[in-house]
From Swiss-Prot:
One of its GO terms (cellular component) is cytosol. It comes from the Eukaryota. This is Deoxyhypusine hydroxylase. HAMAP family: Deoxyhypusine_hydroxylase. Changing residue 237 to L: Decreased iron-binding. Loss of iron-binding. It is an enzyme of class 1 (oxidoreductase). One of its GO terms (biological process) is peptidyl-lysine modification to peptidyl-hypusine. Pfam families: HEAT_2. Catalyzes the hydroxylation of the N(6)-(4-aminobutyl)-L-lysine intermediate produced by deoxyhypusine synthase/DHPS on a critical lysine of the eukaryotic translation initiation factor 5A/eIF-5A. This is the second step of the post-translational modification of that lysine into an unusual amino acid residue named hypusine. Hypusination is unique to mature eIF-5A factor and is essential for its function. Its EC number is 1.14.99.29.
Length: 302
């Protein structure tokens, strides 16, 4: 049983800008796992931080928790044009993930936002909510625990899924469905098909490909992920996801790519490499759990 005092102690780590970013991320993911109003309140407090990377992760976690009590905060973040595009995008995606139709109108309103990543995100979230209404709830559980911005396509043939993924004339929602079906299929052929998506036109799409390759953790995608991370002309949101994917895949070539960009002039890339190197250590070490805020707290001397 977790006490209110323990939740507060983990929350204090999250909102403390003097704490190392890795410790704050671990605290965030611990709060996400614990859930409840206390965790939501602490996560919501951190949206005035100056790290876009952290704030985007806050929104992601609130969406994954699927707790409607987070909706007002996420709507505020989506509407706040002072927030970075990657933060507003993640708030829009989180509203879709929670799955409550009460946000349909606000998502439709922001589907024509001047920031293309925000507009495309809200369009996808509207399609997801409409799909949930048409199909009577969430898609059947797959091999991954994440709440995705689109349900996987029913098609199982990797070649046909690759074709759908890369066809830029198709609706983004259909291409996302192909993306998640490829992730669920797994294996080298699917990983290589997904990696081709890192060259498609939409930055939002490319960033989601990076995220999915991090979930898949197949080393066949490492060269393409490392190349995208190294492209200084690439959207920072895409480079960030590629960095975190390399941290999750955790092969020696990933380490070299992450270390090469640990001092990148783009803050969100630099911080992503910092977090990814921490993930790399976790993946290659003996620690059982990445979201270890509670274990750290209980193991600390009183």
């Amino acid at each position: 049983m977790v006490t209110e005092q323990e939740v507060d102690a983990i929350g204090q780590t999250l909102v403390d800008p003097k704490q190392p970013l890795q410790a704050r991320f671990r605290a965030l993911f611990t709060l996400r796992g614990l859930g409840g109003p206390g965790a939501i309140a602490w996560i919501s407090q951190a949206f005035d931080d100056d790290s876009a990377l952290l704030k985007h992760e806050l929104a992601y976690c609130l969406g994954q928790m699927q707790d409607a009590r987070a909706i007002p905060m996420l709507v505020d973040v989506l509407q706040d044009t002072r927030q970075e595009p990657m933060v507003r995008h993640e708030a829009g995606e989180a509203l879709g993930a929670i799955g409550d139709p009460e946000v349909l109108e606000i998502l439709k309103q922001y589907s024509s936002d001047p920031v293309i990543e925000v507009a495309e995100t809200c369009q996808l979230a509207v399609r997801r909510l409409e799909w949930l209404q048409q199909h009577g709830g969430e898609p059947a559980a797959g091999p991954y625990l994440s709440v995705d911005p689109a349900p996987p396509a029913e098609e199982r043939d990797v070649g046909r899924l690759r074709e759908a993924l890369l066809d830029e004339s198709r609706p983004l929602f259909e291409r996302y469905r192909a993306m998640f079906a490829l992730r669920n299929a797994g294996g080298e052929e699917a990983a290589l098909a997904l990696a081709e998506g890192l060259h498609c036109g939409s930055a939002l799409f490319r960033h989601e490909v990076g995220y999915v390759l991090g979930q898949l953790q197949h080393e066949a995608a490492v060269p393409q992920l490392a190349a995208a991370l190294a492209r200084c002309t690439e959207n920072p949101m895409v480079r960030h996801e590629c960095a975190e994917a390399l941290g999750a895949i955790a092969r020696p070539a990933c380490l070299a790519a992450l270390q090469a960009h640990a001092d990148d002039p783009e803050r969100v890339v630099r911080e992503s490499c910092e977090v990814a190197l921490d993930m790399y250590e976790h993946e290659t070490g003996r620690a059982f759990q990445y979201a270890d805020g509670l274990e750290q707290l209980r193991g600390a001397p009183s």
